[in-house]
């Protein structure tokens, strides 16, 4: 029960992050290698793609977990799917923390 609440909470956090990035129109930068982006894609678009990808991985892990509970999926697939989703979520959280840290540092700069 706790895990399902956490997955819903994680999906909500990802969707809010994606919406915030899309609304703010964060400046352009080169995309990380993990997320292929079109040439000239903005930083906000790259983050939106990344959050969408992580959200899909979380949903796939949840579906695989349910199949595992029913006995339709092998334990190895369940563990692999959940670990992949967890790693992706941790990456997004680390990026979010760095963005917040950079924003706070910029906001403290004298004008």
Swiss-Prot record:
<keyword id="KW-0975">Bacterial flagellum</keyword>
<dbReference type="GO" id="GO:0009425">
    <property type="term" value="C:bacterial-type flagellum basal body"/>
</dbReference>
<dbReference type="Pfam" id="PF02049">
    <property type="entry name" value="FliE"/>
</dbReference>
<dbReference type="GO" id="GO:0071973">
    <property type="term" value="P:bacterial-type flagellum-dependent cell motility"/>
</dbReference>
<comment type="similarity">
    <text>Belongs to the FliE family.</text>
</comment>
<dbReference type="InterPro" id="IPR001624">
    <property type="entry name" value="FliE"/>
</dbReference>
<protein>
    <recommendedName>
        <fullName>Flagellar hook-basal body complex protein FliE</fullName>
    </recommendedName>
</protein>
<dbReference type="GO" id="GO:0003774">
    <property type="term" value="F:cytoskeletal motor activity"/>
</dbReference>
<dbReference type="GO" id="GO:0005198">
    <property type="term" value="F:structural molecule activity"/>
</dbReference>
């Amino acid at each position: 029960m706790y895990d399902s609440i956490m997955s819903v909470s994680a999906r909500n956090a990802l969707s809010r992050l994606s919406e915030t990035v899309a609304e703010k129109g964060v400046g352009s930068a080169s995309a990380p290698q993990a997320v292929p982006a079109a040439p000239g894609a903005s930083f906000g678009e790259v983050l939106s793609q990344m959050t969408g990808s992580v959200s899909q991985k979380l949903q796939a892990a949840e579906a695989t977990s349910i199949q595992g509970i029913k006995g339709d999926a092998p334990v190895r697939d369940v563990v692999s799917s959940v670990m992949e989703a967890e790693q992706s979520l941790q990456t997004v959280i680390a990026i979010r923390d760095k963005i917040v840290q950079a924003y706070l540092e910029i906001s403290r700069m004298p004008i």
